[in-house]
């Protein structure tokens, strides 16, 4: 399963930063219909925004910042250039600059949910959960089903142990992005925290399906089986972990404990300490 790192969610951010390139491509396609016409995009004098997008896609964030800075100089009231430069700054881990640019983008386009999401991610990476939550809330007022805003707000709700709210947010995420293994896993954790083991196991199974080679998926489901009192299925999952990672000491230890207790007594195994999901939104 892929992990979405707080503050450096560049895979997500590129989906945002690439948005202008789609617009530029459409402009060029229309210009090509007129032979000899000037194909320059009037919304991007000098082509700096388009160049910045390409640099950002290639993770050349310093060059992307330079291009977006020139785009801002040419079009200082175009919010997308501030948004894109903020994304590039995040790629360089220059969060103060990223925050300032997201704020400027919001000032210029207060109904663009993406800038609130980006600024919220910066705040979240700086451990300002309440301020980040306010930005995600605002983004969702504008775009109620934005999966990124829902994903990160769900992470905050998990951190605050507001399990049902987290479930509600991650439900939207998995509906919009069913291949998001991290969202399935986090909703499973929230269900498990409410002692809803059947639902948790079903979600862990969905998470495993997105990446069957990840041993941690089976490990998490094994723990849910243990908490549900099904040591046999827990053992099967731990064996699956060891099939992928034979030297996994944790899985070896847990499996041995299960087998020892099963041989010693027919009573259900006492659950081991709860394992929390990874420390960043996924």
Show where each model-derived region lies.
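Alpha-helical segment of the N-proximal tetratricopeptide repeat
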Residues: 43-77, 87-91, 121, 155
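Helix-start (N-cap) detector for alpha-helical repeat units in TPR-like alpha-solenoids
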Residues: 45-46, 79-80, 113-114, 147-148, ...
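Structural marker of alpha-solenoid helical repeat scaffolds
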Residues: 74, 108, 142, 176-177, ...
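Register position in tetratricopeptide repeats
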Residues: 57-58, 91-92, 118, 125-126, ...
């Amino acid at each position: 399963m892929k992990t979405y790192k707080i503050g450096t969610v560049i895979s997500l951010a590129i989906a945002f930063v690439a948005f202008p390139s789609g617009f530029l491509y459409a402009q060029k396609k229309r210009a090509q219909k007129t032979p000899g016409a000037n194909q320059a995009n009037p919304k991007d004098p000098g082509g700096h925004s388009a160049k910045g997008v390409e640099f950002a896609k290639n993770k050349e964030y310093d060059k992307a910042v330079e291009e977006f800075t020139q785009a801002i100089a040419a079009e200082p009231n175009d919010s997308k250039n501030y948004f894109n430069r903020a994304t590039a700054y995040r790629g360089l881990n220059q969060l103060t600059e990223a925050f300032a640019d997201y704020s400027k983008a919001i000032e210029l386009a207060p109904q663009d949910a993406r800038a609130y999401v980006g600024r919220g991610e910066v705040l979240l990476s700086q451990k300002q959960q309440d301020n980040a939550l306010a930005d995600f809330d605002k983004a969702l007022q504008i775009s109620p089903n934005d999966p990124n805003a829902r994903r990160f707000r769900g992470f905050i709700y998990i951190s605050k142990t507001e399990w049902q709210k987290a479930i509600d947010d991650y439900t939207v995420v998995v509906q919009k992005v069913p291949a998001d293994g991290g969202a399935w896993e986090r909703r499973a954790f929230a269900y498990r925290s409410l002692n809803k083991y059947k639902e948790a196991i079903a979600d862990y199974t969905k998470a495993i399906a997105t990446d069957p080679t990840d041993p941690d998926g089976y490990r998490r489901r094994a723990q849910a089986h243990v908490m549900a009192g099904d040591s046999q299925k827990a053992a099967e999952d731990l064996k699956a972990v060891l099939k992928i990672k034979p030297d996994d000491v944790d899985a070896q230890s847990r499996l041995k404990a299960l087998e020892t207790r099963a041989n010693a007594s027919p009573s259900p195994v006492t659950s081991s300490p709860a394992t929390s999901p990874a420390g960043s939104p996924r």
